Amino acid sequence: MSRREKMIAKIKDLMYKPDSIRNIGICAHIDHGKTTLSDNLLAGAGMISEELAGDQRFLDFDEQEQARGITIDAANVSMVHNYKDEEYLINLIDTPGHVDFGGDVTRAMRAVDGAVVVVCAVEGIMPQTETVLRQALKENVKPVLFINKVDRLINELKLEPEELQKRFINIYMEANKLIKNMAPEDKKEEWAVDFTDGSVAFGSAYHNWAINVPMMQETGVNFKDIIDYCNDDKQKELAQKVPLSEVLLGMVVEHLPSPKVSQEYRVPNIWEGDIESPAGQGMITTSPDGPLAVMVTNVSVDKHAGEIATGRVYGGSIEKGTEVYLVGSHSKSRVQQVGVYFGPERVNTDAVPAGNIVYVAGAKGAIAGETICSPEDKIKEFEGLDHISEPVVTVAVEAKNTKDLPKLIEVLRQVAKEDPTIKVEINEETGEHLVSGMGELHLEVISYRIKDKGVEIQTSEPIVVYRETVSQLSPQVEGKSPNKHNRFYITVEPLEDELFKALQEGKLKEGKVKGKESANDFMEYGLDKEEARKVWDVYNRSVFINATRGIQYLDEVKELLIEGFESALNDGPLAKEIAMGLKFKLHDAKLHEDAVHRGPAQVLPAIRNAIYASMMSAGPTLLEPMQKVFINTPQDYMGPCTREIQNRRGQIVDMGQEGDMATIESKVPVAEMFGFAGDIRSAAEGRCLWSTEMSGFERLPREMQNQIVKEIRQRKGLSPEPYGPEHYVG
């Protein structure tokens, strides 16, 4: 039996022992060393050769990732680790740290129970560290901390033992501050990381060594020894005494929960069904014999096997050859293969039980976020995956050769399945399709993926996505149906800030409001009692309130009114961009007694026109997407860097100093960020580190609004000037 076969046999055996499984993610800011760390963990587990680890970028098996040297997708791998004479199955997901790929982090966090947060000792905790930690804690994922690149503190910054310890304590206190702010209430204390119990380790992923307090006690290696090893260029010897994989995987086994422990508190948080039901109990006890429950976190397309869905089995076992039911798409399909990952390759098994990360071939039509169960035991679906950022940059994509048109549409649908954070609009009439993503790099990689699937394309210059809103209360507006027999009286005003923020952060759910149980939630975030009890629908961070009393037949047209409200918000009156942050009230309605005269063809135009007219008479405003930009640069380059930000309509939010490095935090409109990478590099002569993260939408300066509205409308083939309210209700 070869070593590989032995390893696979162990994996197949351990996956039936949920106490011995750890599902973990590795997450960090870009370039803090996640993939190098993952490679060396694999080498320690005997999966790749130690010489190649670190340079091999084993988990970056996409050509784009190897070429750019960054992780774009979240990659999966399973390995076996021996800790205190017990064997454990560790399922590892390496996630991207670049802000444009934050969607992969969100999806990976749904599949895991624990996270190793990697922080660079030189740079400390950076904005993206905070974002990935927030995503982990939001999904109830427990963190441990690894401080990486310690050799650089010693060899480049020449720090003494006391200074080293001080640097570590700063990072660890900062990490705990974030954990205490963002962890679930009952876990704030329990999940704080601690040097003494070994839930914090430090080392060098590149040089393959790591140490924590328990390991120091066991081996007798102390801070001074570490400095000597680094100074004498003997890190290879150090790696033999305190190997990275021993320390890190030991920390994972000791401090991160098994599925058996974590599913008890995670399932109620991500599944809306009845916990007392057989499915609920099966998930909470991680039973391989309970009703099947799988949450799909990722879908990729394989040249030979077709669509491959990766996900987490929460309950029951998924078996090869059985029929399964996809809850979201209401469809059945037959499972052709199931199995687990072993590096980039997939290992087929007959079944994969609860508590494991699984791949499934044959779940046709599944997308990330789908719930798979058995057709006999249908269950409620898992909660949707909330991505922290939303697509803000769009490119138009066309096929270079007309013969590729049908293939391009197929490929775009595939790409949208593989990466749910992008938005694809397919227009079969014009052949111009729009792809929206999180930023320039995200769209470049998507264009590359389309070409990789065999379609040559042309892309337009990137276009920024705007939003529409209003700045004041409108007068009451009357919307008439084409037959003049139905009338609706509507006002609009800006939504309360507190409520808008709660919707943006996902504290309140969007969708039709059932019954009055949500009234308290709306009141908590600023609606008065009367309004809170009468909310009909929440959509695009806007609410639709029925403020009428005793109108005959209103219930019969309620669904149509909601449909009209939602479709009007999808393309606002100002520039056909999505509208958000609005509070609409229906004050009165006059309806024809005969149902024939109040069908969709009458009600939909009436309500849409009333909504458009009310918005156009309430100070219509464009909102533009903003990015936070963080820059680390030597003091001497602070001036040129701040000028670069200010030349792009940016505002400086905060400036700080750490040693001889300056830190600048700023906010810049996305529209001004194109080409920033090259410009900031030349401003600081290459001596700066920078990163961005989404910062929501803000009002466009009034003096720019007319020009930008005109440009958007012309691009969309509309008349250059938006229509006034009288056009809609005249």
Swiss-Prot record:
Q: Name one GO cellular component term.
A: cytosol
Keyword check for Metal-binding: no
PROSITE patterns named among the record's database cross-references: G_TR_1, G_TR_2
Q: Which Gene3D superfamilies match?
A: 3.30.230.10, 3.30.70.240, Elongation Factor G (Translational Gtpase), domain 3 (3.30.70.870), P-loop containing nucleotide triphosphate hydrolases (3.40.50.300), Translation factors (2.40.30.10)
Q: Give the keywords, sorted.
A: Cytoplasm, Elongation factor, GTP-binding, Nucleotide-binding, Protein biosynthesis
The record's principal subcellular location, in a coarse class, is: cytoplasm
List of residues that carry Diphthamide: 597
Q: Where does GTP bind?
A: 28-35, 94-98, 148-151
Location within or outside the cell? Cytoplasm
Molecular function via GO:
GTP binding; GTPase activity; translation elongation factor activity
Query: By its UniProt entry, which CDD domains does this protein fall under?
Result: aeEF2_snRNP_like_IV, EF2, EF2_II, EF2_snRNP_III, Elongation_Factor_C
Domain named tr-type G is located at 19-260
Please list the disulfide bridges: none
What top-level branch of life does the organism fall under?
Archaea
Give the similarity note. Belongs to the TRAFAC class translation factor GTPase superfamily. Classic translation factor GTPase family. EF-G/EF-2 subfamily.
PANTHER family linked to this entry: ELONGATION FACTOR-LIKE GTPASE 1 (PTHR42908:SF3), TRANSLATION ELONGATION FACTOR-RELATED (PTHR42908)
Q: What does this protein do?
A: Catalyzes the GTP-dependent ribosomal translocation step during translation elongation. During this step, the ribosome changes from the pre-translocational (PRE) to the post-translocational (POST) state as the newly formed A-site-bound peptidyl-tRNA and P-site-bound deacylated tRNA move to the P and E sites, respectively. Catalyzes the coordinated movement of the two tRNA molecules, the mRNA and conformational changes in the ribosome.
Q: What is this protein called?
A: Elongation factor 2
Organism encoding this protein: Methanobrevibacter smithii (strain ATCC 35061 / DSM 861 / OCM 144 / PS)
| Recorded name of the encoding gene | fusA
